[in-house]
Amino acid sequence: MKRKNFAACALALALLVLAGCSNSASDSKPDTTPQATPTAEAANGKTVSPLPSGVDLQHLNDCMVAVSFDKGDAFVDGKGAMQLKVKVYAYDAFDTVDINKLQVGDQITICQQNVKVTSLEQDKNAAVLINGGADNGGYTLVSGEASGFYAVGPNDTKLYYALGEATIPVSSDLVLEDSSDLEKGTRTYYAGDFLTDGSGLTYHFVPDNTTITIEGGYVTHMQRVYTP
């Protein structure tokens, strides 16, 4: 009888030991629950994008755009209509709130390029200098427009980038107001002056100084201004 009781007790003790081992193994099992990983914004900073330019190469019907073109890009087509082949440009404008929140470690898209912000400061004119500013290989943002800040180059003119090319019909009433030469003052040219060598028109039409106005799909006005 004692032997039976001893066997029963031994069996019960063995079961308790096994149960204890099972719980211990469960408690020490590595935690395989997936851990949260930093988002791109948390790890690399946020990305500040410019406001939409509003320029659509496929619908240049009623707008004013910065352009460049060379001698010979104004021509008469096979149907007798004057055309102007241009490169169309845009510049980046940024919301003031976005620029005020910009920090070192963020990225900002300028001229369709993502720029890592490694240094950030403000000069005495309240211009925002990114990575040393335009004079030191970086970028300079200035305010002064309703849209907020925009990027400028070393000569303080807007920093343009090309969107593409377009050939646009020219109105017979086209007027060019040319004030690119301070010594000569403002001069006026007309559509036909682009088609002749005797007009005295000089060719330096670049986005820094030239804009065209398009109305109803036709170039109706052009302005060229002085740039330093």
Regions found by a protein language model. Name each.
Residues V17-G20:
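C-terminal motif of bacterial Sec signal peptides marking the signal peptidase cleavage site
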